[in-house]
Swiss-Prot record:
Organism expressing this protein natively: Simian immunodeficiency virus (isolate TAN1)
Chain positions found as Phosphotyrosine: Y155
GO BP term, example: DNA integration
Listed name of the protein: Gag-Pol polyprotein
Motif (Tryptophan repeat motif) on chain: 1012-1028
Enzyme Commission code(s) on record: 3.4.23.16, 2.7.7.49, 2.7.7.7, 3.1.26.13
Amino acid sequence: MGARASVLRGDKLDTWESIRLKSRGRKKYLIKHLVWAGSELQRFAMNPGLMENVEGCWKIILQLQPSVDIGSPEIISLFNTICVLYCVHAGERVQDTEEAVKIVKMKLTVQKNNSTATSSGQRQNAGEKEETVPPSGNTGNTGRATETPSGSRLYPVITDAQGVARHQPISPRTLNAWVRVIEEKGFNPEVIPMFSALSEGATPYDLNSMLNAVGEHQAAMQMLKEVINEEAAEWDRAHPAHAGPQQAGMLREPTGADIAGTTSTLQEQVLWMTTPQAQGGVPVGDIYKRWIILGLNKLVRMYSPVSILDIKQGPKEPFRDYVDRFYKTIRAEQASQPVKTWMTETLLVQNANPDCKHILKALGQGATLEEMLTACQGVGGPSHKAKILAEAMASATAGGVNMLQGGKRPPLKKGQLQCFNCGKVGHTARNCRAPRKKGCWRCGQEGHQMKDCTTRNNSTGVNFFRETHPLVGVQTRELCAEHPREREGSGAGDSTDTSGANCPTTGDDDERRVLPQVNLWQRPMMTVKVQGQVCQALLDTGADDSVFCNIKLKGQWTPKTIGGIGGFVPVSEYYNIPVQIGNKEVRATVLVGETPINIIGRNILKQLGCTLNFPISPIEVVKVQLKEGMDGPKVKQWPLSKEKIEALTEICKTLEKEGKISAVGPENPYNTPIFAIKKKDTSKWRKLVDFRELNKRTQDFWELQLGIPHPAGLRKRNMVTVLDVGDAYFSIPLDPDFRKYTAFTIPSLNNNTPGKRFQYNVLPQGWKGSPAIFQSSMTKILDPFRKEHPDVDIYQYMDDLYIGSDLNEEEHRKLIKKLRQHLLTWGLETPDKKYQEKPPFMWMGYELHPNKWTVQNITLPEPEQWTVNHIQKLVGKLNWASQIYHGIKTKELCKLIRGVKGLTEPVEMTREAELELEENKQILKEKVQGAYYDPKLPLQAAIQKQGQGQWTYQIYQEEGKNLKTGKYAKSPGTHTNEIRQLAGLIQKIGNESIIIWGIVPKFLLPVSKETWSQWWTDYWQVTWVPEWEFINTPPLIRLWYNLLSDPIPEAETFYVDGAANRDSKKGRAGYVTNRGRYRSKDLENTTNQQAELWAVDLALKDSGAQVNIVTDSQYVMGVLQGLPDQSDSPIVEQIIQKLTQKTAIYLAWVPAHKGIGGNEEVDKLVSKNIRKILFLDGINEAQEDHDKYHSNWKALADEYNLPPVVAKEIIAQCPKCHIKGEAIHGQVDYSPEIWQIDCTHLEGKVIIVAVHVASGFIEAEVIPEETGRETAYFILKLAGRWPVKKIHTDNGPNFTSTAVKAACWWAQIQHEFGIPYNPQSQGVVESMNKQLKQIIEQVRDQAEQLRTAVIMAVYIHNFKRKGGIGEYTAGERLLDILTTNIQTKQLQKQILKVQNFRVYYRDARDPIWKGPARLLWKGEGAVVIKEGEDIKVVPRRKAKIIKEYGKQMAGAGGMDDRQNET
């Protein structure tokens, strides 16, 4: 500081301090402005020593002047300061900054004109650069014009003594400064002026060197390269190459690539830059620099995307910090200067917090930034809060506050507040609307603030702080200092009883002194003696130093500035001062200065031995209960061996000592058996409890985590740590009311003593509720830590924790230490034994490395004799390995254990299974690794066909780096084809990807677009088709045959049919052709469906290459329309083989027994002596009904008594309903009072749809707009018509609005939200939206307006289409559900009433009364009773119903004395 401040001395310093910062302003230049200017020059890699003389100042001015127009406010302020300093050195008399800047700009203009008029030869003879010679004539360093006084050459092109221009490589210091700028600033707006300053006079070669120095920013450099290429191409278009020879003495004109330094040499660049333009000179360095700045502007917009509209002052943010952020962002805004000026004038005030906004508005229009900063200094931050607090304290204790410099105001009443700003009573300075009072709030004088005021509090000043603190004199409780004690467990070494500052003393017991133990329900104030002076002080563990006010200490002191509550505070630092607290005295460093309250900091607290004691935070107990009507388990303990009894006794002693179990007496009637097993590879025992009976009786729980996290979903992190929570379940408390049900007994040897009984106080191992409760508790414990560190990955599964971050090693370890301490405060220990901080990390069965992951080592079993259990374990390990090992198969191995077999039953390995196992072993020999997920790259999934119905797939982002692999061998049905299998596999991969990454990958499928489209058109029951593309990876999927949609005119038509007798199982299949041919075949032990298939087989066998087949069997149509290429049925397999040999096939259906030509003939042919033929009526009426209402086939079959095949054919013949047939899935049943609601769009209008989940009943209407108000109206209408207890919607803004919340609250409706586009959520209403639109399309031509068509479609869906459970319409099903629900509730009430009665009864042959039995139902003529496990029906005349009043003594009364009911 001294070196920089010494640039001016004597008269020059006086002149400097007499110059005003602004014209007509009061503030003047001080030495601190020189210090600031020197620091700024060093930031821009310029030598601060240049400020010592006029020549150096002029060089700085020339360097900064090009950046003034586009530079930041800091650059402009630095330029102005150097201009003033130049004038002081040059002896120019100026009054303020503006005059100095005008003088400098005038000299710059003169020098520029002289430079233009002077010839190149004259400049060389002078041997100097005119640019670097100050106009004042005080020249220096004439031989090397670009050399700084310190001797370093910052500018690349220099002129030697002979006047020859040569290149000086750019200095390492300049490159280092540029790299530091990028590392510290990134690509924010400050980079551009810094680059401009560092690259002044540089050649393209040097500019490329600067870009190469930051080449690790690949994305930014690529964008910069694109901008440079565009500008180079534009240069080439504007400056085409000249044809013909080059003129003598002229340089060639550079191309765009030459300017960028790609195709030009360094010598050419120097010549272009130093040669006059008349001789072909081109400033290639400046041009290239301009191109780079254009690219940097683009990078600033990309890397600093924050809009100026988003910059708002926080409630506690200092105004100066807010202004810094505001101007930093506005520099990055791509707008004209008038627009930026308007933004500054408007948004700077508009986005300030309320405290500052009141003050800024009071300043009026046109206030300068300096006035704003002055007025808002100390407002809004912690210092302002401290002032308000002190103001309130002063108002409460002092009689009044005198803010006026003149007369006194009347004393304030108790509880009144007085403003520090305006002096009025009734409000505080924070809420004062008067203009911010300038000057000091203590002495009233202007020119300084209160923190800099040297005047002490007196009668004429402001009584800002109280002389006596309100808590002085309040004596804290004195307790004996806590004796050091060992804590059982893993040494979580802090005491656990109190929360506060505990101050024990050291020394022997006889010298132990008493110090207070302070709880934090009040401020920890104590009486302190500082060098014999008594005062009150606050114990502050957050303060580094101890600070006192209004005390006078003896001894030497040094000045110091510290950051205090009110900003920076000047203090005096005294060393080795005696400080006494209680009866203990220490010597420490003490600071004396202006502080609101005396503070004892850590430097003294540490010497006193004070500690902060945190109690273990109580974990919230989850309430648990048994299932309704059940009692706890009462299972007797089975016998145990002597060594097991001894082992269990020792284990339970330890658990009881740790408080995890507690002893119970005989009053607890419940018991669960226990036993012990030895741990693997050790002689220690492990206690196990058989909670099977308790699990049956305990309420059900919902697993919060549906699966384990997968490493493929992890992001690549610099630092990773894996932790394990020790004794996880034993760290979570069990519901005290439920503990009695966990009681168990340790028996004694030979029953020499009663068994020892215990019950669990924590979650027991093996109990069904432990996993769910532990997951829930662990999540609540980790939530605050997750919110505090959002950039850190924390994966939690049961007691395993994965923590990944991009911090450096030291910061990451601090983070892990903080997490472990956080868990420890809740009583959760993370033992060092399972603490992993170095790779490889063993986690969840995986092995994690910094750049890859794999599964842990897999060892396949190789027993001498294979059993079912061995095969099961083998398949499980292979399935686990298949997630990263590509090509694993298990189909043949799974065939070995088909059926119901015992675990120990031997299995003979088939040749195919042995071959499959050997292939898998070869795959596992080579180590395979997986990659980590990168959110910036797209996700792809490649699928390969392995044959025999087995498939394999890989999910990856980069070729050769698989995230995950897998296999698939699920067959969707008996008759299938490869495309149906492919659709199932795509569905599986899609679900996996949504779970792991939250997105669906792009699929690479081994099927051509024509094949897929052909099958998709005919077989439409694919619920979801992803984005995909064809890859030519054999073997490809293909359709081996295709069914035509139109008959083949030249081909023979075969009418086929089959018949079978249900009783004799005899049948016949045959066909009749349109050319007079016919044939039949008798069948044994067959069915109607098999006979129909045999008829098709006969027709295919006897037909040519092209054939038309007509059948009346819907079963045959269903099998063959799916285009199967494989089947488990022999007859279907034969048909498939024959179909593949045909060139063209047409398959059609006609209704049976309707007198249709060929069908009637073949029906008679195959039915003779086999079955009777029936004829139907009502088909025409059903056809008319469907044309009007488009009912589904079940409604037609019910209403008109038609067979399903006929009703389905009526649907198939309708052009509007045969678009995509009937879905193959059925109705899903849910709770009776749940509705799903969604909004869909049609014809540019909004349709809101509500679906009753259990019945499929729809309420829908067209609403004017998709808002919360309209949605709330619809929900209230729905609740007024039907019982609605719960609605399920997506997260749309209309459903999350306040209006919908209010409507649900008023109607007592529980509102749940789903996930948009997730197949596991909103499925019912999404499906109904689709169906409703199809119905609207069918009836749209019958209605003029869409709202009418919607109502018609709702009516058709609810009352004209049957199906699902009960074969009802949706309306009938809803009424049935509601009626049944009401009847069930009434019945339950009656059952509860009769449960309090007991029944005595007699059998028919036994006159002895039996009972009491439990009454289940009382009817008119009989009663239903339960005795033991038997349920009986007894006539009323043989039963007596007794109300149970409790146990009665034997002999106290007979049957006649008891109350009965007959």
